[in-house]
Amino acid sequence: MIVEIRINNCYIFNQEVVFSMNADMRNKRFITNVHKENNFNILKAAGIYGSNNTGKTRFVKCIADIKNALLNRKSRLMSNLFTDNSICELGITFLEFNREFSFDFKFDENKEEYIYECFSEIIKDQYGNERTQCWFKKDVINKEYYCADENLDTMLPVISNNSLFFYQIDTTKFKYLDEMKKILISFANKIDIVNMNNIPIKHTIELMKNKNNLQNKIVE
């Protein structure tokens, strides 16, 4: 379940944009639209409205790019045309296996390399206090490397940056890295993006005719 999306220097976005699904529990009007899990309160559904060319479609494209990166698919990320910066920044916070996690990465469009990765677990107690536990961090630019698995830090600087780190090595030998990989892949496989423009007009007409009670089947 998506909790937050973070975008910077991607497509139309030339500065950081944060889309949050965290529910404001002070507002009781839409309490039925709140999913509660392990002290986290997340909106079940949200809508994005705005005029043309404000980034709505590109926002969804960024979610697709995050999914593609997590599933080791070729990246088509593009940096903003009006900034002298080829580095795209994306991040996502999500619920998976009744826990909240955060993953951020930076992709250099020119070099086609992932120059930054950071995975953390967000732990929240019954009083609303949060703490972040970092599992993995790889910062190529600043040469900062960390992994909760012992003896893995020394490997990080010498591994290729062509894909996310957990696709570069056999993770089964490392407890935290292997669990991180399973969490991210499991979550990414649950992201579904429906493009309404790709629905054939013929299918729409058949549905309107309600042949063989198609409308009832869709409602079911």
Model-derived features: positions:
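Short acidic, glycine-rich loop/turn motifs
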Residues: I7, I92-N98, S120-K124
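Pre-Walker A-like glycine/lysine-rich segment at the N-terminus of P-loop NTPase domains
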Residues: M1-A64
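Electropositive, glycine-dotted interaction segments
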Residues: E109-E220
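Short, mixed charged/polar active-site loops
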Residues: N14-E16, N98-S102, E130-R131
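Intrinsically disordered, low-complexity boundary segments flanking structured domains
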Residues: E4-N8, S79, E150-T154
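Generic "edge-of-domain/loop-turn" microfeature
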Residues: I12, R26, F97-R99, E112, ...
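Conserved P-loop NTP-binding catalytic core
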Residues: N41, G47, S51, V60-K111
